Amino acid sequence: MSKRMNAIVPNAVALACALTVAHMGSAWAQTAANNDTLKLDELVVTGTASGASKMKQSNSISTVGVDQILQAQPTNSSDILRTIPGVRAESSGGGGNANVTVRGLPISAGGARYVQFQEDGLPVLLFGDVAFATPDMFLRADGSLERLEVVRGGSASTLGTNAPGGIINFISKTGEEPGGSMGVTTGLGYDEKRFDFDYSGKLGEKTRFFVGGYANMGQGPRNASANGVQGHQIKANITQDVDNGFVRLNFKTLDDKSPLFMPAPVSIKNGVLSELPGIDPRKATFYSPYWVQDATLSKNNTLVNSNVNDGLRVKSDSFGVETELKLAGGWKLSEKFRTSENSGRFISIFPGDDVANAASGTKYATGPKKGQAYTGKSFTATVFNTSMDDMGSTTNDVKLSKTFAQADGSKITTTAGLFVNVQKVALTWNFNQYLMEATDNNPALLANSKTNSYGAIDLGTNVWGGCCTRAIDGTYRTTSPYAVLGWEKGALSLDGSLRADQQVATGSYNQASNNQFKPENTQAINYTKNFNSYSFGGNYQLDKDTALFARVSKGAAFNADRIMFDPKKMPLDGSGVVPINEVKQVEGGVKLRNGNLSTFVTLFNAKTDESNYDATTQKSTSNKYDASGVEVEAGYKMGAIRINGGVTVTDAKIVATGLTPNRQAKVVYQLSPSYVLGDATIGAAIVGTSSSKDAQGSGYDVTLPAYTVINAFANFNIGKNAVASLGVNNLTNVLGYTESNDGRMAARAINGRSIKAGLKYNF
């Protein structure tokens, strides 16, 4: 298929999906509006000062229920986001480390710089783009999840710190419905077993509780390593209803180990990606039983040995308090508090060079063939081994609001709030390099005249010019007062909000030399940054089924580690200018119900000004971006048929060069049909993307081909309380590349086909 056809076909498919849904909606427009699959009248609480329905808000908001999440057959928490219009989720990193953004805002180095991941309305981590410590690593979707609320743009700029692009809020169950469930899932053709549970009940007339979680074990769909998947999460809460509101205690403990997936060696010729013999990017991990212990340096200059096969190991223990009270005089007080201890270790294998013929005299250094001659292909395996010493976060968000009725029938709602956060960013980086057999099936380490006896090429500060043996100890204290003023009369509502963020950064960072952290290399962190954000919007409801909205916003994302170790020697001790990443947005759209069809259409423009440093490419960048487009979310339901879909069309560019930002596709589309047939429900979640460019200007300019991935499921009710399920991720086993890498022939891909079966009992 030609490159032009690769670009045209996804556009045509997306347009056809949208037109098909619209046609069906018109054909059955006489059906009752209670089939509103987008739930436009549902109360949402994310990115808003006071809860209101989607139909009455001037924001673009999506809600995803548990049924839709299960239908999507996600492989991790960020994979769920691929089904939401306007969200770009590169969720091919395994148990975490996803790249997430919205509406053409750039992903310059990794993580989720412009989007805030929340759990029950508070940030998981204040920064979304800390290298080797992203918020999705500390999130797990399990039986405790009630729903997902996703705000793109809008008032996220003023109702969250570091959230100018949007807010992704994982909302937990709180025990409103007594009962529970137990379920077990097992991989078919691969080793992974998982147990999920949840239970709600009453402790008294006004006291209820909820507890839920999961435990899993195995190797995962890529058969990464023995016990590469192992862990558990337990979440619980107790709610005490009082006459004027409620008080809730929240608890969470997470201890999880999962594989990480880096770009795999590939061939790149004239910008075209292709597989290498023996390496399938859909299954490659380069974890293996033939690894040696990886010896690294601690901040105290002692040696630490790690099992490379541990992959991503995260621990999170949190405690929170939430209260909402109606006070005298019509005032309402809302407060949320949470403190979390977050830590772990990130270990993955990254190709440090291109695959080539092994040098003469190369032998197996590990494995059953140790000592035998090796004459095949090899590459340099760079082990990213980063200790997340302390990513703890403590947050309190309190707000006071009141609605004032006016003589002319209008209402004025005022809200004043204060957000306070203390975020620790303490990590220890170590990169070691080994010579590895070029295969994705339990590769061994190799030895020759350029390695030591067990295959190590370079260790510690000898790797990549000594760039990446690092110690970071930062503390970021953020204080953010905010205010919201809303006015409503009849069909028209207007709102404006302001936020004043102040961030005080303290601590130090150190780059080792000669395999030691030396006091004279310590650099101070000691600066204060301020930023004022705004958001103004309006919504006009033409009738109960149609509303128009518009909004203009300005917000920012503060920097943390991404401006440390800059080759330009940017001082962070308060003596120089510390950059802030700024976003300005304009958006407007329509919300419409027509019988069984619900539609949410938003036009948007976003301008971004950012600074960044990427450790893997060792490049410092400062760019302005401009992105315009349209996102469409639609849902249709009639009887046993349900279809949800969406399409996002984005025209983004780097202002200085006119180039499209790396990995930014013109079109991304989703389609999720399902059909109920007696006791059975069958369906699919289809996600596709047009082609995009990557690694521009690196010498390996690459076209990431268009692809469509189909996840399918079938559920069968066994009696009244049991459900058997069969799910397939990537049904057609498509090879979908999500990124390449500057300066070397490597690319990361989504997982290949995997099948799982499950049984769930509700009680």
Stretches with model-predicted labels:
Residues G154-S155, I167, I171-K202, G212-N223, ...:
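Short strand-turn segments of transmembrane beta-barrel domains in outer membranes
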Residues P178, K206-F209, N244-L249, W331-L333, ...:
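Repeated loop/turn-to-beta-strand initiation elements of outer-membrane beta-barrel proteins
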Residues I234, T239-D241, F246-G320, R345-N385, ...:
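Acidic/polar loop-and-plug regions of large Gram-negative outer-membrane beta-barrel proteins
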Residues M391, S410-Q423, T428-N430, M436-A456, ...:
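Structural signature of Gram-negative outer-membrane beta-barrels, strongest in the C-terminal barrel
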